[in-house]
Amino acid sequence: TVYMLPQSIVSVSIATALFTKIASAAADGNQTSMVRNYQIGVRSSLLLTMWMAAILGAAAIPVFQILGPSNAISEMVAYANALVIILPGLAGAVVIIFSQRVFYSMEDGRPVFYTVLWPTLGQVVLGWTLMMFLPPVYWLFGALFAETVSRIVQGVLSTYFVRARLPQANPWVVIGDMVKYGAIAVGAGLLGMGALHFVGAFDTSNTVTGAIWGGFWRAV
């Protein structure tokens, strides 16, 4: 649920709003408008989604402390690590959801199937391969890493399927946005994580963060 918040709030909302324009342009045969709205949707969603992903990644442990205050710190750290591993996959998920809108507007579901098929098979292979070489305690992290790679590959692959239908859609424009906003999110997340660690976000009982949260909940 926490992982899907950025996509549910941002990507789905923007994709729903732009789908009407994309579908209308498809009905009129206006490929230029389709490409423009597709790229605008991807860029704006990547900006906001990866911003939210950076916040969630940096504040992963405080978030899980709020959701499960009675859980042990070790459990929260494990949840937080799992969340951080899969968050980069949101970049691919953003591109996928807008690429799907392009295919749906052209009433062609085949690219959607193939976009998911091959990366998913690769995910299974990569996941099992990592499990062969990792200690059992890291198997879950290996599986999550494989899922993240699969989502990113799905996003990249979908841009080429879009170009096959819309020659004006340059895949590298979208891929460049994925890399740019992904790198910014990673940098911002690391800075935020460092700042929270400095003020003591990992212990809600005897820290500045704990005092803030305690005061907030008492006020509520």
Residue ranges of each PLM-predicted region?
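Membrane-embedded alpha-helical bundles of multi-pass transporters/translocases
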Residues: T1-V220
